[in-house]
Design a protein with these regions (language model features):
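Bacterial N-terminal signal peptides that target proteins for export
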Residues: 1-11
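Bacterial N-terminal signal peptides
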Residues: 10-19
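An extracytoplasmic/periplasmic, membrane-proximal ligand-sensing/linker region
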Residues: 27-42, 46-57, 251-312
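Bilobed "Venus flytrap"/periplasmic-binding protein-like clamshell domains
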Residues: 35, 40-65, 75, 98, ...
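A bilobed periplasmic-binding-protein/Venus flytrap-type ligand-binding module shared by bacterial periplasmic
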Residues: 43-44, 127-138, 239-257
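A structural signal for short loop-to-beta-strand junctions that line the ligand-binding cleft
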Residues: 110-123, 234-240
C-alpha cells in the first residue's frame, strides 16, 4: 500500500501530526510494526504533478524493498522537507547541499547523508547557471548590471547560496549590482518568470554535460525540456558557477539499522535493476547512487554558516 500527501511548506507540517512511530524506539525485530509508513520528502522547485509522476515508480519499489507502506510528501518549497526531517516526520529525502547544511546547522543529530547521485561521467558535482531570454540584449554577465535577478529558493545551493557567495568572493554585492533580486518560488518557476518577463535573469542548476538543446544530461533545464515546458532556444546562459557538490540522499539518524541497510541496498542497485525508474527520479541521465558522508559537505556547511551570520 502506497499513499501520497502534500506539504504546502513548513507550516503545513501540521498535516503530519498523526502519530508516526519513533524508529529510535524500535528493536530490529519489530521495527516494521512501529512504522505506519515510511515517509519520503520531495523537494519543491518543480510542479507537483510532474514530481509525483516521476516518483510514483520509486514509491512502490521502496515499499517492496522495506516491506512497509510508503508515502510521498511533495513540499511547496525546500523548507517544508527540511522541517519534516528535523521533526522526525519524514524518514528520507533527496536534498541539495545547502538544504543538508541548513539541517545540520540546526540539529547535527537529525539526519545522515548516505548517498549522492553521480553524473554520467562519474563526477560528483554540478553547476549553477544564470540565464536570460534569448531575445534579450543581455549577452554577458557584465550586461546584467542594473537588471533584475530571480533566485530559485533561499535553501537552494545552486539557486541561491553558491551563486550569491561566489559573486561576493569576487567583490560583487548582488543587492548593489542588480536592480533587484527576489525568489521565483523554485527552479522551474523562476525559469517561467524570466520567460514571462517578470525578471531579466534567473539562476538554476545543470550538469553542463551533453547536448545544450536537450537541457544537458541532468538538471532543472533537462527536466523542463523533457516535460515540454522549455525550449532551450528561448534562453541564453550568461554565467556559470564553479562546481557545486551534488546533493545528498539523507535518512534520519534514528532510522532502524535494518531499514537503513535495506534502503541503501535498493538505492545503490536501482540504476541497474530499475533503469527507467532511476532515470525518472534522477531528472535525466546520471551515473547511479554512490556512497557519501558528512565530510563531503563541510565546505557547504561553512558557506551556509557565513551566510547566516551575514544576515543577522
Amino acid at each position: 500500500m502506497s499513499m501520497t500527501r502534500t506539504l504546502g511548506g513548513a507550516a503545513a507540517l501540521a498535516i503530519l501530526a498523526a502519530p508516526v512511530a519513533a524508529p529510535v524506539a524500535a528493536t530490529e525485530a519489530d521495527w516494521r510494526q512501529s512504522f505506519e509508513s515510511f515517509n519520503i520528502g520531495l523537494l519543491g522547485g518543480e510542479n507537483e504533478a510532474d514530481r509525483l509522476r516521476r516518483y510514483d515508480c520509486m514509491q512502490d519499489l521502496v515499499s517492496d524493498a522495506l516491506g512497509v507502506p510508503v508515502e510521498l510528501f511533495p513540499a511547496a518549497d525546500y523548507a517544508g522537507v527540511m522541517q519534516g526531517l528535523l521533526a522526525g516526520q519524514l524518514h528520507m529525502a533527496g536534498l541539495g547541499a545547502s538544504g543538508y547544511a541548513g539541517i545540520y546547522l540546526q540539529d547535527p543529530e537529525a539526519v545522515e547523508p548516505v548517498l549522492t547521485t553521480a553524473q554520467i561521467d562519474g563526477g560528483l558535482g554540478y553547476y549553477a547557471v544564470m540565464y536570460v531570454r534569448a531575445d534579450s540584449d543581455i549577452m554577458t554577465f557584465e550586461d546584467l548590471e542594473g537588471h533584475s535577478l530571480a533566485y530559485a529558493d533561499p535553501n537552494s545551493a545552486s539557486g541561491y547560496l553558491f551563486p550569491r557567495g561566489q559573486l561576493r568572493m569576487q567583490g560583487i554585492i548582488d543587492d548593489e549590482f542588480f536592480s533587484r533580486t527576489g525568489f521565483g518560488g523554485g527552479h522551474e518557476q523562476s525559469v517561467i518568470a524570466v520567460l514571462n518577463g517578470q525578471y531579466d535573469a534567473g539562476v538554476t542548476w545543470t550538469s553542463l554535460q551533453g547536448e545544450y538543446e536537450e537541457g544537458y544530461t541532468r538538471g532543472n533545464l533537462r527536466r523542463m525540456v523533457d516535460n515540454g515546458l522549455l525550449d532551450m532556444n528561448d534562453i541564453r546562459i550568461v554565467w556559470e558557477s564553479d562546481i557545486i557538490p551534488n546533493g545528498p540522499t539523507v535518512v534520519r539518524q534514528d532510522l532502524p539499522e535494518e531499514a537503513r541497510e535495506l534502503l541503501l541496498e535498493f538505492l545503490t542497485g536501482m540504476k541497474d535493476a530499475h533503469p527507467d525508474c532511476y532515470a525518472l527520479t534522477a531528472g535525466g541521465e546520471a551515473g547511479g547512487y554512490v556512497p557519501i558522508d558528512h565530510a563531503f559537505y563541510e565546505g557547504t556547511i561553512e558557506l551556509r554558516r557565513q551566510e547566516l551570520q551575514g544576515s543577522r
